[in-house]
Amino acid sequence: MISQEEVPQSTNHSLSFSSLPHEIVVSCLARVSGSYYPKLCLVSKQFRSIILSNEIYKARSHLGTKENRLFVWLKLPTRSYPSWFALWIKPNETLTNDGPIKKQSTGNLLVPLPCSYNYQVLVPSVIVGSETYIVGGYDDALSSSVWFYKNGKIHTLSKSPSMSVARIDAVVVGQYPNIYVMGGCDSDESMNWGEVFNIKTQTWEPLPDPGPEVRGQLVRKMKMQKKNVYVSSEKKDYIYDTEERTWKVTEAVFNFSWCVIEKVRYIYYNKNCWWLDTKSKDWRKIKGLDFLNKFRETDRIEIVNLDGKLVMIWDRFTLSKRNKKIWCAMIALEKCQGCEGIWGKIEWIGDVLMVPLSYSFLDCMVISI
């Protein structure tokens, strides 16, 4: 028989994350949805440091817990360089009312990202063939570098010859064997504001000077069709003819936004959202979205595919007209029963960030991190 004196006495210990090994804390945080990260950053300096590091993304990739996130690229008058913002969505956010849609305070926000996010996730890149080329970065030591992944494998990261000038937030587009890089440097760089990299010869060549008007504006987007590079800046759109090596102003070539969801192509154009009927080759209007008109004051609207749902982003004036607010709506798409139409069902709508009147909306994208 065991006496009472021999019975081990349990002791209550107060355990905390700070007492755990660092790698265990990283592993735990990597398993948590990114929707909770804004509040977790407020828990402790340790949590904030891990969440804002590249370490957490390596762990999420290893554990298979990566999520699709929406990033927005803005130019604010108070900052020297454009800034990336991430859309933080409250977990299980959805409208519960079945009545008329009204403006609601969703709690969803566009949160500015520190440079550590920018460098690790959002550096300019382009896919050419089986290789992904990463151009520049947010570190002075890397801002003139070009790296590439062979066959999509990170462990085969290699370095190509450096650009003529360092670039931060450059815009790139590629069509084998060339990669075109523009902007991201001082506007006085007339000789090297734009460069082209030849993959075959592994050499850089400067592009003709487009002039101070082009160099003085931020490049929002670029796309390439056949021999032409289409460049969209803050105020105008331009065409660079790669064969003639000439620049010219063109009509707006980015006057609509598009995305693909479950093999269906969607565009926002002429104040409406449309989908392409591949059988008839006709563009058809998405039904059920007329209510959005009262929330919009601009023709400039971006749409993206976020986990199979249509996300719309735009801006509008505040009541005082002294600022603007960026708005966002998440829409679930449903095919009509017994017909060939598509309905849009709002899940939430609200303003996510206040910005100065003089800001510029540059771009948005969805990235798996």
UniProtKB/Swiss-Prot annotation:
Presence of the UniProt keyword Repeat in the record: yes
Residue ranges of Kelch repeats: 131-177, 178-224, 228-274
Domain of life of the native organism: Eukaryota
Signal peptide interval: none
InterPro entries noted in UniProt: F-box-like_dom_sf (IPR036047), F-box/kelch-repeat_ARATH (IPR050354), F-box_dom (IPR001810), Kelch-typ_b-propeller (IPR015915)
Sorted UniProt keywords: Kelch repeat, Repeat
Pfam families associated with the record: F-box, Kelch_FKB95
Record domain F-box: where: 14-60
Record-given protein name: Putative F-box/kelch-repeat protein At4g39760
Source organism (scientific name): Arabidopsis thaliana (Mouse-ear cress)
